[in-house]
Amino acid sequence: MLGNSIQLIGKEKNYYMEQYKVKGMSCAACSARVEKAVSAVDGVTDCTVSLLTNSMSVEGTADAATIIRAVEKAGYKASKMKAGKQSGGATDEDDALKDTETPLMRKRLIASVVLLIPLMYVSMGHMMWNWPLPPFFEGNHVAMGLVQLLFTVAIMVVNQKFFVNGFKGLIHRAPNMDTLVALGSAASFIYSVYALFAMTDAVVKGQDDMVMHYMHEFYFESAAMILTLITVGKMLEAKSKGKTTDALKGLMKLAPKTAVLVKDGVEQTVPIEQLHIGDLFAVRPGENIPVDGFVKEGNSAVNESALTGESIPVDKNPGDPVSAATLNQSGYLLCEATRVGEDTTLSQIIHMVSDAAATKAPIAKVADKVSGVFVPIVISIAIVTFVIWMLVGRPVGYSLARAISVLVISCPCALGLATPVAIMVGNGVGAKHGILFKTAVSLEETGKVQIVALDKTGTITKGEPRVTDIFPVGCEEAYLMHAAYALEQKSEHPLAKAIIAWGDANNQTEAGVGEFQAVSGNGLMGVRDGKHLQGGNWNYISGQIRIAKEEETELRKQAEVYASEGKTPLFFAEDGKILGMVAVADVMKEDSPEAIAELKNMGIHVVMLTGDNEQTAQAIGKQAGVDEVIAGVLPDGKEAVIANLQKKGKVAMVGDGVNDAPALTRADMGIAIGAGTDIAIDAADVVLMKSRLSDVPAAIRLSRATLRNIHENLFWAFIYNIIGIPLAAGAWVHLFGWTLNPMFGAAAMSLSSFCVVTNALRLNLFKFGKKQRETA
């Protein structure tokens, strides 16, 4: 949501996703109206409106002017967001998240309360508590009525926004929450004015009994109290809504505003916008790193917790990458900028969290449908309530009070906020710990997975294999390893790293290999000094060599021993003659067994995918504690395995992004682990910045906690209206004698949205500890 215009890859030239600020929305009915109006514009393929951030995301080919006109025709105002040049720079996104509502609400509330106190004293103090009135009012009922009228008018002027927005919505045939408040308070006021005129006429005619009758028909204090209480609720709601975006606002504040540019050996402090790719910049101890780059000179420990949630500092040496907003703790670093502005890791995280908040979870669709028709239905119920009570013989004042109660107790805001506030808070909590959900859908659906498929290398293991055993056959160990080192030099397979690392450590010299060819998932071949080298697993190598039965038996027997220990045997041959075998083992991550155990405790079936042979795979799977091992899976075969697993339930595929894209895309939920600074992994729905496997169950628990919170919010929003509206209408009067004064209805309405937002804020208490249960 930071950029104002993004051309989508694979789309036609004029196809864009653009962000807009929307002004004038007060409830879910408003956002539904805007969404409907913009979606009807030719060229718009998708439109999502966020009531929480007062923003709108539009996808398609329609031009901005047409979209803005559609919003204005619906009765609201819109403007295109401007892209910020730097992650740390001010943008319209900052403005969209800035809490401008609370200060205004506070001023309105103070003015309303100051005016309400004398109004309540005059209208109810003498009658209810026998408080003394000024002598001027003794026997002067018209004066009492006029004073109440003046105070009420003043309070209505202070809260004129309800009337302006409410009646504007009515004119545009798009009634909203403000319409309900405006109609309720206006009806109370108009009827009270009528009662005041009628009482004045009775005073002139000397009809004392009618004077007292009409005195009791004054609802000035109800109109004023409704407006004041709704303002209290809106202020509490605005303040709480501001807190839901704290995590996102915190991310925006992380990047420094300046950087120390080093040019020709001279240091100069410049605005961060003046730093470009390739520039050198200096970072002293205690300073935040301004942009992404790598260390040219110096050594230090850098705290990356702002991005990853990992509190342990990471050592940085020449050549190591550094990220914007991380804290240099100990040494002086001279770095070269590689990514600046909106390309930094920090900006990408802000984009991701912000964009996720702009999307809608499937569960929100029910609330959106109800919100779209909620206000017209409530107005209809209020009219029917008034008519029914009049028909059964109740006085106008009583009938009107019931109708007003229906109007002011109904709350579409609670319905509209139930899902987005929970999504925003849940996403923010995840981002602070290096868990990034790309969309609201991914945050909702991750918790529903039943099967988790884990790619072995880089996910369960560290992806840092090492040579454990060397078994030469018919040649010296040095000859075998030199051949293996020469062949693996050109391989990109993770296991090749082990042999290359061994060769480097043992001062092996690089031998040129020509005609190199990699056979996907099986082996390698190449030519060295006129001789053909082959390397790979037994299935591949056995078809390339001639070997005596005794030698094969001995070799296979030793390979089985290695495999039973969780090691992967690699075979090498030259000109069709076996040279021997090298056993390689990857190191398991410290938290893998515990994370897998936690997944199993959550009722999730855990599957390990690996290209290793069955025996090696089973040994590693047993160490890790997985439920099922699928061995011999080639990189291009993972997608088919995922498709097969999906027949048994919802599948999450967890991989490090290397050769995993098709499988991540095929799975119901693709989770990329260990993304580090490369978080723009298109195939993944969830991005885990660290290589901690424990973040997988944490992401699932957070998703479940968020979904549970949404259910609680929706339950409260629906049950509040289901119980409140009949109570306000007087449906239980004849059975239990229960009824509801309009003032209490307004108080209930003012608290409903506040309760929903406050409940969502409980997600900030979510624990990521190893032993924590699914609590929020």
Feature locations, PLM:
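Conserved catalytic phosphorylation-site environment of P-type ATPases
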Residues: 307, 366, 401, 414-487, ...
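ATP-driven catalytic headpiece of P-type ATPases
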Residues: 105-107, 326, 447-492, 522-607, ...
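Flexible metal-binding regulatory segments at protein termini and peripheral loops
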Residues: 1-143, 155, 168, 266-267, ...
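Conserved cytosolic catalytic loops of P-type ATPases
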Residues: 42-59, 69, 217-218, 249-343, ...
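Transmembrane helix-loop-helix hairpins at the membrane interface
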Residues: 104-258, 369, 470, 737-740, ...
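Juxtamembrane coupling segments of multi-pass membrane pumps/enzymes
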Residues: 199-203, 209, 224-285, 316, ...
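Membrane-embedded alpha-helical bundles of multi-pass transporters
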Residues: 128-142, 171, 190, 429, ...
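Conserved ATP-binding TGD loop and adjacent catalytic N/P-domain core of P-type ATPases
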Residues: 32, 45, 449, 528-530, ...
